[in-house]
Amino acid sequence: MATIDELGCPLSFDELAEALGLLEDTQREALSRRLRAMIRDGQLIRNRRGGYCRVNHADMIPGRVIGHPDGFGFLKPDDGGDDLFLVPREMRKVWHGDRVVAQVSGTDRRGRKEGVVIEVLERAFSSLVGRLHIEKGVAFVLPDNKRIPQQILVPPDQLGDAADGQVVVVAIDEHPTEWRQPIAHIVEVLGDHMAPGMETDVAIRSHDIPVEWPADVFEQIADLGEEVPEAVKQGRVDLRKTPLVTIDGEDARDFDDAVYCQPTPKGWRLLVAIADVSAYVQPDSPLDREAYNRATSVYFPDRVVPMLPEVLSNGLCSINPHVDRLCMVAEMYFDAKGKTYRSRFFEGVMNSHARLTYDQVRDMLEHGDPELCERFAHVLPHLRDLHALYKVLHAARERRGAIDFDSVETKFRFDDNGKVAEVIPLERHDAHRMIEECMLAANVAASRHLLRKRMPAIFRNHEPPSEEKLEDLQQFLAELGLRLGGMPHPSVKDYAELLEQAKDRPDYHLIQTVLLRSMMQAVYAAENKGHFGLALDAYTHFTSPIRRYPDLMVHRAIRHLLTGSKPAEFSYSHTQLQIMAEHCSANERRADEASRDSADALKCEFMLDKVGQVFEGLIVSVNSFGLFVELADIYVTGLVHITALDRDYFHFDPIGHRLTGERSGKAYRLGDRICVQVAAVNMDERKIDFVLADGRGQEDEGVRRGSRRRGRNRDREKRRAGPARDAAPPRGEAASRARRGEWSEEKASATDRDVWRPAVPGWGQPVEEASARSTKEKKAGGKNVSRKNGRKVAKKVTSQRHPVHRGSRSRS
């Protein structure tokens, strides 16, 4: 750096080597490696003449590209500064996820800084998955990743046995430039895009979810048996006679927690026993490195990609009934008001006395089911004690001000052919909440224990809403005659009081949704900043080390203290923990996106035979380009594009979350109920189009005219409006990672409940999450066929009046 600065001009490799006096081949090779690393890290760039020059942070900005399906993008600077807007011309050079150096080129008409890409430091993708299209002898792949809208050319001699329309994996031979499309060759044919399970296969590959286990992991676990060796049980607290039980969903396969409660003179004693994963996964072992690489288990509608091999996740680390298991135990004592007055952690060995489901527990506690009560008579008294403690803890949580947003979680029911037969809501009752309170209590106890001992660890932070979001929220509430207390720094209790005040209003859902969207995203960090949504001064994740790497790290920190070691002697520094926390947060988001993509594809497939049908729905998002509507009872979301609304010019109010007609004054607002007709399903883009079904703009000719215009008008509207700031699809579709909509293992909702960190596009996310579709229609065989980049989408247009399918379920 000093040499380049001193000479004040770009230097070639030979000039640099000479200036540094590096003449030996080994020295030059070392210099070459160092220069490559500095380019990768954004310290240097190499110009087109091969000269190395320093990145001047005054005008050169290294960062990562965030792509948008519509072709534009952003540069997210490494230093956390303001994003740079990248116009489509610049995005032709790069892909979503690439690390680049950009330069500020000016500002657009909205005042945003625009940038030009100077150098690509690191490519994000060496392979991609997508659908193969062959048109007039030209073969190209459309990536499944919608943030990469470019076609990838495949030379004729690289097609192999792949056929038009199949889903393939391609290896990139030439990345895109401003003047050249990317070129690739096919390395794997996944099969027909409608094959059962293909949605998940594609999501796994599109998001680079690790599936295969490295050979050294198999070598490490080869000697693990099905039973815990007697030798490793020594020195642990023996809990095998304590009637600990697991309570999970019916289809759960891995059981990582067990509970036991008993009354005491002051209140209750609660044991939360967690599978002792850290006893088997040693730091920096092959198993540990792969667990860190994955960071989390990924839950899809039809399968799970685990963080740990099955011999551990479903075997030695799963608290199966009537077998000995190693555990890490949180022992907590609560007074009559639910306040913890003593807690400790210890290593134990346990034997689960029963494997219970949520519904079984509910049927015993609420309905007194005689058969179940007799079958589980040996644990029923302790379940009643646990339920009594739950009521006290829940009341304490309400007094604290923690909020619990209403949402509907859903799951898929598949037929014998692996196709979606039904999208059904998951019932959540006191048995779920009872376990949730136990897990929250253990997580809180772990965080306070670590802080009290000044132990370095990974925490789960949820910061208060930003000033900008609060300002928008206040403007919205003012229109409704409401006010959020505690401004300019409201507490979560202020949120809870506002929800209580509004609970009987007809627009309650609207108010709740806007409050939810004002929340920040929960993340992992090495520094504790508290948890706003739970109204806690400290929080961490302790209860799920089978499926979350941060929990495993918390177990290691607690074990370090249990051995009598000093915090300063911990194997991980604060810097290392922060890097690990950021990695885990990123992989958590990746898992959410992959799960959502799979679920979206399945919902589109489910709706294919429903084109033309009419449903009642709820407006769950309003944008400059239209309305997102969630259908009642089946919880599927689609877009009513602005061109399919009444014949009027609609103004978008981002604060009021509404579109208002200029001439008619007709307003469509978040939370309104409307009737829609399913107009089109696009499997390639995983999008569903609706039109109004109540006569307004629904005439046959009007629909056809709107359909013909829809593609170009969508693009025009979004270009005019710029990035949408309020693109949230359905409530009930995973209000958080811990409450993924189609996650069949309900324990997720009973352990974390970061309901303020939605895993749906646009909720607390930048513009790139807001998606819309552009189509161009062509009449064919009595149906309209929209074609985009060679993809055909069936559309049905009908003037027939359909009755409204009103479900019996009332949703508010």
For the regions a language model picked out, list residue spans one by one.
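Non-cytosolic beta-sheet module surface loops
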Residues: 65-67, 132, 619-621, 680-682
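Basic/aromatic-rich interaction segments and small domains that mediate binding to polyanionic partners
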Residues: 79-83, 90-93, 623-636, 684
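Charge-lined substrate channels and their catalytic hotspots, especially those that engage the 3′ end
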Residues: 1-271, 278-327, 355, 360-363, ...
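A generic structural signal for residues embedded in beta-strands
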Residues: 102, 170, 622, 676-678
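Intrinsically disordered, low-complexity mixed-charge segments
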Residues: 1-2, 7-14, 23-35, 42-50, ...
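Electropositive polyanion-binding surfaces
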Residues: 169, 175, 192, 202-209, ...
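A short macromolecule-binding patch
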Residues: 82-87, 148-154, 635-653, 700-706
